[in-house]
UniProtKB/Swiss-Prot annotation:
Enzyme class: transferase
Chain residues that bind S-adenosyl-L-methionine: G261, I281, L290
Single annotated GO MF: RNA methyltransferase activity
Region Disordered: start-end pairs: 1-70
Organism per entry: Mycolicibacterium paratuberculosis (strain ATCC BAA-968 / K-10) (Mycobacterium paratuberculosis)
GO biological-process terms attached to the record: methylation; RNA processing
Assigned GO CC terms: cytosol
UniProt entry keywords in alphabetical sequence: Methyltransferase, S-adenosyl-L-methionine, Transferase
Record field: compositional bias (Basic residues): 1-16
Family note: Belongs to the class IV-like SAM-binding methyltransferase superfamily. RNA methyltransferase TrmH family.
SUPFAM superfamilies: alpha/beta knot, L30e-like
InterPro entries, A to Z: Alpha/beta_knot_MTases, Ribosomal_eL30-like_sf, rRNA_MeTrfase_TrmH, SpoU_MeTrfase, SpoU_subst-bd, tRNA_m1G_MTases_N
Protein name: Uncharacterized tRNA/rRNA methyltransferase MAP_0479
Enzyme Commission identifier(s): 2.1.1.-
Length: 309
């Protein structure tokens, strides 16, 4: 009878090829009451999605800088004379000493830098078989300041004078500008995190040690940082050959950030739009432009002159 739960399942007749087979009649059927809908994948204990959900979150990768190695007797000696922070001086065994090597070893010892004598083959491998003249200096990555640190550096000696670099890719220009900032009473230098020169041993050496005194900060977004500084009371002065204001007419008494563009590209469009003024340097003769570091030095010297009264 239909609906009779005690009714046994179908029974195959005896004598068939497969023989009699007895069904369960529903007696051994697993009960489904109360099980509910199938849970989502991340809630099933053995599902890969659940294991991924239970694992600790991955930390975002941090952008790191590699240690720099300065090669050659003249470059190494210049770095040590300029006070470039270094962790180790490598000298190849059997290297013939001259005045440069002797002075380099002496300066490294006086500065507490480790001096390691290594087989020439090891130094070749460390330097990628580049010309090293038997000596190499290991320089750790530069520790950049935060943009806010530059404002704090200027807080005790207002008015502030900061320099920002736009499209400057040559580390020698960066080092020379840092040197000018130190010479003319500036408080810090701001560079973009991407598409910009960084503080390498070359930049440090060109700064003649000023990089040890003047903080250099990196901005994730240069335009946004300039806008933030403008909101905090700084006037943003762009430096470009096609500027509307001549340097002679610039009022340098206010808190300023001077934005320096490259000699070739000048200021980028967004940076230029966020400048309160764009200043150009009057020049005589047929010269069309100045090197970026030279132009920055001229402007900083004029601002310093005005502030001295």
């Amino acid at each position: 009878m239909a609906g009779n739960s005690r009714r046994r399942g179908a029974v195959r007749k005896a004598g068939t090829k497969k023989g009699p087979t007895v069904g369960s009649g529903g007696q051994r059927r697993r009960g489904l009451e109360g099980r509910g809908p199938t849970p989502p994948a991340h809630l099933r204990p053995n599902h890969p999605a659940a294991k991924r959900a239970q694992s600790p979150p991955r930390r975002p990768a941090k952008r790191t800088e590699e240690t720099e190695t300065v090669l050659g007797r003249n470059p190494v000696l210049e770095c040590l004379r300029a006070g470039v922070p270094a962790t180790a001086l490598y000298v190849a065994l059997g290297t013939e000493a001259d005045e440069r090597l002797t002075e380099s070893v002496s300066r490294a010892a006086d500065s507490g830098i480790s001096i390691l004598e290594v087989p020439r083959a090891d130094l070749d491998r460390m330097t990628g078989n580049h010309l090293h003249q038997g000596i190499a200096l290991q320089v750790p990555p530069y520790i950049y300041a935060h943009p806010d640190d530059l404002l704090e550096a200027a807080a005790g000696s207002l008015p502030a004078l900061l320099v920002a670099l736009d499209n400057i890719s040559d580390p020698r220009n960066l080092g020379a500008i840092v040197r000018s900032v130190a010479a003319f009473g500036g408080h810090g230098v701001l560079i973009p995190q991407r598409r910009s020169a960084s503080v390498t041993a070359v930049a440090w050496r060109t700064s003649a040690g000023a990089a040890a005194r003047i903080p250099v900060a990196r901005a994730t977004n240069l335009t946004r940082t300039l806008q933030d500084w403008a909101d905090r009371g700084l006037r943003v002065i762009g430096l470009d050959a096609g500027g509307d204001t001549m340097l002679d007419d610039l009022d340098g008494s206010d808190p300023l950030v001077v934005v320096v563009g490259s000699e070739g590209k000048g200021l980028s469009r967004l940076v230029r739009q966020n400048c309160d003024e764009v200043v150009s340097i009057p020049m005589a003769g047929s010269a069309e432009s100045l090197n970026a570091s030279v132009a920055a030095g001229v402007v900083l010297a004029e601002i310093s002159r005005q502030r001295r009264g």
